[in-house]
């Protein structure tokens, strides 16, 4: 169910009402209704769309609460300074789950997200469970029906479970099983967070991955080269970040906290190596769970990640 943006989420410290160099995002954000827009190609500005859904997390036997993530992220983002004043940012609201099956909600979200991806230079999709990734893929494939798609995921988990239905742990298996023209690269894999069956599937499907242990201190030149080659080898790139990849000391508000996760600055550096590419039209950020957050640390981390990628 599509819900329009809530303007009351967008508040913050007011430093000036007249000097744009002192403006914050709550002063410059605009609001839009994707249901009223056609499938047009404009390639300007940035779109925000929330995936206020954690049904996939529930189906994956995780701890729920991520459906409140999009609004928590927007609240935290609203008060950050607008340092990229040349790019218009439009909040298109959220999609909520009210269908019998999760896949039907994913398709509804995909239809709306596709309009934003088509219309804007980049679209940030805010979750919500990581089942957002399959919806993001459906949207990407709608916009680019013939293109090769490179899926880059910063995540502690492969999320390639074989369940026979959509959950937060099945998105990338669904993509690979349905699309011979899609490939998958995962950065941040936890050796303690994936079964041998998932590693076997990764080998079977030629999934490229980097362990979290390899990203503890810096992004090494071989990993940088791997990312660059992967982007180069595909027509379009779908980028997604699961916040459970970040160590729980920095990101307690997630569906599945990481005991040995990677540091926020490493995620920022990885993102900065992906997002500047013109092939990246959509970025999803998943599993931000306000129920378990502390002092809004995780919401602020996600907000700063989006902010960091815009400047």
From Swiss-Prot:
Binds 2 manganese ions per subunit. One of its GO terms (biological process) is L-histidine catabolic process to glutamate and formate. NCBIfam families: hutG. Its cofactor is Mn(2+). This is Formimidoylglutamase. Catalyzes the conversion of N-formimidoyl-L-glutamate to L-glutamate and formamide. It catalyses: N-formimidoyl-L-glutamate + H2O = formamide + L-glutamate.
């Amino acid at each position: 169910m599509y819900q329009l943006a809530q303007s009351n989420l967008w508040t913050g410290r007011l430093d000036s009402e007249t000097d744009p160099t002192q403006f914050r995002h709550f002063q410059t954000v605009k609001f839009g209704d994707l249901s009223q827009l056609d499938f047009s190609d404009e390639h300007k500005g940035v779109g925000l769309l929330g995936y206020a859904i954690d049904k996939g997390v529930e189906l994956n036997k995780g701890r729920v609460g991520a459906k409140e993530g999009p609004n928590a992220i927007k609240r935290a983002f609203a008060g950050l300074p607008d340092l990229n004043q040349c790019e218009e940012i439009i909040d298109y609201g959220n999609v909520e789950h009210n269908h019998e099956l999760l896949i039907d909600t994913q398709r509804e979200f995909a239809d709306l997200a596709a309009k934003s991806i088509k219309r804007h230079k980049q679209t940030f999709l805010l979750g919500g469970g990581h089942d957002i990734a399959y919806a993001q893929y459906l949207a990407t494939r709608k916009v680019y029906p013939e293109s090769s798609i490179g899926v880059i995921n910063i995540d502690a988990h492969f999320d390639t479970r074989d369940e026979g239905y959509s959950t937060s742990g099945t998105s990338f298996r669904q993509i690979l099983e349905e699309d011979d023209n899609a490939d998958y690269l995962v950065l941040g894999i936890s050796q303690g967070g994936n079964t041998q069956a998932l590693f076997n599937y990764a080998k079977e499907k030629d999934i490229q991955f980097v362990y979290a242990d390899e990203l503890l201190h810096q992004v090494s030149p071989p990993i940088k080269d791997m990312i660059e080659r992967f982007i180069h080898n595909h027509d379009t790139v779908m980028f997604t970040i699961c916040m459970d990849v970040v160590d729980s000391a920095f990101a307690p508000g997630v569906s599945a906290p990481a005991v040995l996760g990677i540091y926020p600055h490493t995620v920022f550096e990885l993102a900065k190596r992906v997002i500047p590419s013109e092939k990246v039209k959509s970025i999803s950020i998943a599993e931000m769970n306000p129920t378990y957050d502390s002092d809004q640390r995780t919401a602020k981390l996600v907000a700063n990640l989006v902010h960091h990628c815009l400047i």
